[in-house]
Amino acid sequence: IVGPAVTIYEDVTDEKLPPQHALDAIDESASGSVIVITGNPSLETVAVWGGLMTAGAVANKHEAAVLNGGVRDLAEIRRDYDFPVYAKTVTPGTTLGRFKTISANQPVTIGDVTVNPGDLIVGDIDGVVCVPQAVAAEVLALAQSIDSRELEQAKLIIQSGSLREGLAKYGRI
């Protein structure tokens, strides 16, 4: 996946509120966006994303969801949608009456990574990274170079039958 970040921050509440900024972000963000939701550390105890939010994201042609919290309805998401969801946890619990959306499209922090709105979110089966807009072209060129070199290195390893030969020629494994 590759797309610009749309950020959402949620915090603890006793109010019975829907995640309004998150719903607005899904409906109003440009197609190709990656919805990034984070917030209070206890967000991992509830599902901030599920089947209906996935349906909205698919309808609006978003790229993926990255959640520093929980997801639910995984069987439905996998069965009915070709939509990547990267989540910290899987849990059936709802956010209603526990969390509310505090902000949208403001810088957020996940672990030690700050994600700014518009930063490129890049992911695959191995995980997700955030590429700041200011260095996106440089990072893309470097990634393409590494990918090309590793393809050549893999060919050499297979042809020679030796990891050592691949390391000697390319300097890394």
What are these model-derived regions, one by one?
Residues 1-117, 131-173:
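Feature captures the catalytic cores and cofactor-binding loops of soluble hydro-lyases/lyases
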Residues 121:
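C-terminal binding/interaction regions
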Residues 126-129:
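Channel- or pocket-lining gating/hinge segments that regulate access to a cavity or pore
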